[in-house]
Amino acid sequence: VNVARLMFFAFVAMSVSSVSYAQDADCEAVAGQRAECAEEAMKAADRVLNDRYQALIDRAGSRYIFQYQSRHEEHKAFLDRLKNSQRTWIKLRDSNCRLEGFENEWDKPSYSADLNRCTAKMSLERALYLDGILPAH
């Protein structure tokens, strides 16, 4: 079971990093359209993050409702903490990305590209983190 879990996490890590690398490489290939490319990368990463967030909600439902004979209070408490954690993390991500892009803040296209690249990178990292919470048995 532990080997299977390690293999799963290794696969997810490689998937996230290869998606991130592919996005970076694609954005560099279209030098004149970096801002648009970074925006598309951010949107794709946001979809991945939303999918992983929903998957965690589904795993929590499976664990607390079905596997542990209807522990509704624990399920609700977990979902409340997850929602709070996600909201707090989004504030941190946005603040960190504004900091990373500070030097280009007055150059709108560069600043926008910096923000979107940072948001995509951090969102993919968060998606990987969410995959590790309440792993399926």
Which residue stretches match the model-derived regions?
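N-terminal alpha-helical modules
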Residues: Y21-H137
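Bacterial N-terminal signal peptides that target proteins for export
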Residues: V1-F8, M14
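N-terminal signal peptide c-region/cleavage motif recognized by signal peptidases
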Residues: A13-S20
